[in-house]
């Protein structure tokens, strides 16, 4: 199984606890939710979460997604998965709390 992952700030996740699906702000601004493969997580954290104390890492089973998953090249040419719609929470297999170095 090739799991995919989404990094989210705890406050953003908490605001959506009582709904069946998750929407990141990027869905409105870019049309999709950014995801990563396991080997990309550390780079994503280093590039996008500088100065952040804690994040949650959602482990997602792509076979359980109810919205379209597309793998696309970033500006660097590296391939990243994106979800073009909301993330159904039934596809989330686990949530890891990760403390980061400030």
What function would you assign to each model-found segment?
Residues 1-102:
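Conserved, structured core segments of small domains
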């Amino acid at each position: 199984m090739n799991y995919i992952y989404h990094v989210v700030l705890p406050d953003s996740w908490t605001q959506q606890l009582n709904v069946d699906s998750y929407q990141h702000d990027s869905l409105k601004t870019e049309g999709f939710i950014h995801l990563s493969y396991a080997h990309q997580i550390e780079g994503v954290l280093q590039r996008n979460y500088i100065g952040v104390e804690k994040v949650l890492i959602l482990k997602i089973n792509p076979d359980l997604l109810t919205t379209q998953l597309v793998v696309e090249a970033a500006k660097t040419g590296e391939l990243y998965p994106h979800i073009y719609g909301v993330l159904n929470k039934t596809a989330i297999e686990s949530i890891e709390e990760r403390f980061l170095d400030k």
